[in-house]
């Protein structure tokens, strides 16, 4: 091998290159101008920068969560509106006044029935859970039409 500043190694007509390029001619195989090397490096780095990340595109059926132009695929928050103290007291009185004087003396039966009574309204149909319940929107102009 010769003692030249080139980065190529020639072994019996086989050329090993560190960088991809065109086939070298015998006269220019050992020396390449440094300006061409720099141009090759800059063009290869420019090509790598052109990659773009995929963008999310929402369909018309996607929920506009909280009417703040935030598109979501799920309803993730359970909202309980604040009530005044008077409303809370009235609800508590109503729930406790429903119990009649014909309560059984067995307290274990009452405790088991209490859980069922809270989850079912007076008509016997269970209440939907937070993910099954669809909130009532006052401004229906922002919602898609249901067909």
From Swiss-Prot:
Low complexity composition bias: residue spans: 22-43
Domain of life: Eukaryota
One Pfam family, short name: PPI_Ypi1
Disordered as annotated region, ranges: 1-74, 87-147
This protein's record includes keyword Nucleus: yes
Compartment list: Nucleus
Annotated Acidic residues bias: 103-118
Cell membrane is among the record's keywords: no
Keywords tagged on the record: Nucleus
Biased composition (Polar residues): 1-14
GO cellular component: nucleus
InterPro entries (UniProt xref): PPI_Ypi1
Function of the molecule: Regulator of type 1 phosphatases which maintains protein phosphatase activity under strict control.
Family from the record: Belongs to the YPI1 family.
Protein's UniProt name: Type 1 phosphatases regulator YPI2
Organism: Candida albicans (strain SC5314 / ATCC MYA-2876) (Yeast)
Gene name as annotated: YPI2
